[in-house]
Amino acid sequence: MVLIRVLANLLILQLSYAQRSSELVIGGDECNINEHRFLVALYKSGRFRCGGTLINQEWVLTAAHCDRRNMEIKLGMHSKNVPNEDEQRRVPKEKFFCDSNKNHTQWNKDIMLIRLNSPVNNSTHIAPLSLPSNPPIVGSVCRIMGWGTITSPNETYPDVPHCANINLFNYTVCHGAHAGLPATSRTLCAGVLEEGKDTCKGDSGGPLICNGQFQGIVSWGGDPCAQPREPGVYTKVFDHLDWIQNIIAGNTTATCPL
C-alpha cells in the first residue's frame, strides 16, 4: 500500500509539472483591467502604432523606432473601442533620443523619452510605473503586455491588451539566436525557449516588468514571432537611468551610455 501511495504521488507531481510546462507555451491572455495603469498607447493618424510606459505624471518611456510625427498618446485605455471613463489624451511636448540624429540599431539606443504637453492625474486606470531600483536578474519571471498582434506571421490585433509571463535569459542566448547581434549590448534577452510566447508587432515600446520592476522596453525579435529558441530583445532600462533622470531634471544635453 505504501508503494502504491508513493507511486500515485509521483504520478500527480508529474502530471502537475506537465500541465505547468504546457501552460508556459500558450500565448497571453487579456490583461486584468487594473494591472496596466501605466501602459499607454501611441497613435498616428487614428491608428494604433506602439505601446509605452508612463513613468511619472509628465513623461512616457518607449522605443525610438516608435517615433512618428503628430503622435497622439492615450492613457488609461483598455479596450480600443470602448473608452474608460477616465481615459486621457496627450500629445508630445518634447521628444528625446540617445542620439541627436535619432539614430538607433537593433541592439543600441532604441529608447525615446516623451514629455507630455500637460501632466496627467492619477485615476482608476492611470498611474505611473517607477523606474527600477535594482538591475535585472537572469532567471527572473517577467511580465509583458500590449495591444500587439496575437498571431504571427498572419496578424490579428486584439481590442484589449494581452499579458503573458516570460523568462529573463542571459544575453548570450539572444546573441546565439539572432544573427548580427554584437557580443555585448545594453539590451535584455527574454522569452520562452519553447514556441508560443513572445511580444510581437505592435507591442514595441511597451514594458518588460521583472520581479515587479520596469526593466526593459520592447525592441525587436524574430519574424515570425514566438519561434522556438528565439527570445525577444529589450532595451535595458537600468543602463539608461542616468540619462532618463538627467533629461527629466532639465539637462537636455545629457548623453546615453556608450
UniProtKB/Swiss-Prot annotation:
- Where located? Secreted
Enumerate the active-site residues.
Answer: 65, 110, 204
Q: Pfam families attached here?
A: Trypsin
Any stretches that span the bilayer, and where are they?
none
Which residues are glycosylated according to the annotation?
103, 121-122, 154, 170, 251
EC numbers for this chain: 3.4.21.-
Q: Which residues form the signal peptide?
A: 1-18
Single biological process term from Gene Ontology: proteolysis
Q: List the disulfide bonds.
A: 31-163, 50-66, 98-256, 142-210, 174-189, 200-225
Purpose of the protein: Snake venom serine protease that may act in the hemostasis system of the prey.
Which family does this protein fall into? Belongs to the peptidase S1 family. Snake venom subfamily.
Query: How is the quaternary structure described?
Result: Monomer.
Q: What is this protein called?
A: Snake venom serine protease KN13
